[in-house]
Amino acid sequence: MAGRTYRRRFLLLGGVCLLLLLGSMLVGRYGLSAGKLLHMLWARLTGGAADWSVSDEKVVFAIRLPRIAAAALVGAALAVSGTAYQGMFRNPMVSPDILGASTGAGFGAALAILLGAGYFGISLSAFCFGLLAVAAAWLVSRLSRSDPTVALILAGMMISSLFSAGTSFIKLVADTQQQLPAITYWLMGSLSAIKAEDVRFLVLPVAVGLLPLFLLRWRMNLLTVGEEEAQSMGVRTGALRLVVILCATLLTAASVAVSGMIGWVGLVIPHFCRMLFGYDYRRLIPAAALFGAAFLLAVDDIARLVTTGELPLGILTAFVGAPLFLYLIITGGRRHEH
């Protein structure tokens, strides 16, 4: 019975995600009918004649499609990353930035903007510094003789603080006319400048990060029972933790490199997935990917609809995510009382 319920929920979530993918193609100031959109997509898939205007071609395939693909990939990546980190650390308050990937990426982007790099250079710098931040946290934690998990969290907090201070210093010395506004806007997160090249940049690291987590999701259940219990079952917990950290970091760094710093997705979505699909990571990982993609697609649609000048996604996810998280805290407390 429970298995049938979960299957229905997966089908519903997948259907919502598909509807949002198609519906998002219609959102924007440039008017486009659903029939025309479906005709264009079908013709492109089947190699049919392109009997539409140049404007339609540009809006659908050069502007909206890359943006929607990026929103789905970033949402899925951040949600799965948060789910993996929360399971590994056995802490529901953990977010994808726990080890400094987001702040490291933010520093890398700010540095690239300060040095006058182009759009791809900014993304590449953000990606590399995101990975560097987590690598530094991991190396520092290995030097500690205290509990490995606690040492890793503390090292991540320290590295994150250092990169945050570095970003603040860059903002202090940046040109106030061009560089400072560019840094500030990038740090707030947005998909408004996404191009097809960004999606191609994003696909590989997201795929490399998602695939091992998907294949090892049943082993991740064993991490939640504790270190000694997992080892007694024959699980090499050290190697498994390292793989989870590498994959989750890759997902976070790649997402932030393309979209900027978008918070709350990796913190809130795993909670909703546990409410709907339980604590089994065999269901949680794919559910988080679908839920995260749907959530960021919806938020990005709101960003395009609310004002003529788009709101940064980081602001909107905070406006939406914070009340939802507060609701989860209150209802969770009531469930424990009863």
Predicted regions and their residues:
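Alpha-helical transmembrane segments in inner-membrane proteins
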Residues: 1-338
